[in-house]
From Swiss-Prot:
The record marks D60 as: Reversibly protonated during proton transport. The chain crosses the membrane at residues 10-30, 53-73. The keyword Coiled coil does not apply. It comes from the Bacteria. HAMAP family: ATP_synth_c_bact. Signal peptide: none annotated. GO terms for cellular component: plasma membrane; proton-transporting ATP synthase complex; proton-transporting two-sector ATPase complex, proton-transporting domain. One of its GO terms (molecular function) is proton-transporting ATP synthase activity, rotational mechanism. F-type ATPases have 2 components, F(1) - the catalytic core - and F(0) - the membrane proton channel. F(1) has five subunits: alpha(3), beta(3), gamma(1), delta(1), epsilon(1). F(0) has three main subunits: a(1), b(2) and c(10-14). The alpha and beta chains form an alternating ring which encloses part of the gamma chain. F(1) is attached to F(0) by a central stalk formed by the gamma and epsilon chains, while a peripheral stalk is formed by the delta and b chains. The gene is atpE. InterPro entries: ATP_synth_csu_bac/chlpt, ATP_synth_F0_csu, ATP_synth_F0_csu_DDCD_BS, ATP_synth_F0_csu_sf, ATPase_proteolipid_c-like_dom, F/V-ATP_Csub_sf. It comes from Vibrio parahaemolyticus serotype O3:K6 (strain RIMD 2210633). This is ATP synthase subunit c.
Amino acid sequence: METLLSFSAIAVGIIVGLASLGTAIGFALLGGKFLEGAARQPEMAPMLQVKMFIIAGLLDAVPMIGIVIALLFTFANPFVGQLG
């Protein structure tokens, strides 16, 4: 039982960490490409900005889903009931 809970805690840490890391890398690439495109064609900057904010909103969903899964493993672990 203790090993299951400790492995669940490790899994929660990995889920939250990787979700945050992936989002940070995604935001860095998104911002860099936006600045690159706006510098190359300044007249396209407003259209690129709208698309950038849409993609940024979708990128924010990744850590939110990871947090929900981590909270599920933390407070309502589905594997504890299978121990019998």
